[in-house]
């Protein structure tokens, strides 16, 4: 359940991640950075046929690429701490080199897919900087310490 007013204050789900994956993570992370509470109920039951609507539109390979693309976009948009940003910048070439040696293309394709949306991610990043009350380190520490966010 979501507080409608806060959902609207956050701008709702970001179309940056369209058509799938990371919308809920993005929304929750932005709420936490604004100092709002986010609750997770591990005992709740949700009935959802896994990828039932997604699979009709997207093939498995496409889903994997979009998920990897959205990982890049999430970091570019939301991770503001310089040390974490630097770590991500360092790891991008390492993932790409690893895929090259394994004759895999997932991270290469996803990276170039993400580059097309990078301007929108960086524009949103500026907005997030203005609204963030807590650092990424503080939020990640809270998530890691608070078992409520873990399954």
PLM region spans:
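Catalytic core of nucleotide-sugar-dependent glycosyltransferases
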Residues: 38, 56-83, 105-121
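Hydrophobic side chains within alpha-helical segments
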Residues: 26-29, 73-74, 90, 102
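Catalytic beta-strand/loop signature of glycosyltransferases that borders the donor
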Residues: 38-51, 59-60, 86-87
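Non-catalytic, C-terminal membrane-associated alpha-helical segments of glycosyltransferases
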Residues: 82-151
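Short secondary-structure transition/capping segments
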Residues: 28, 51-54
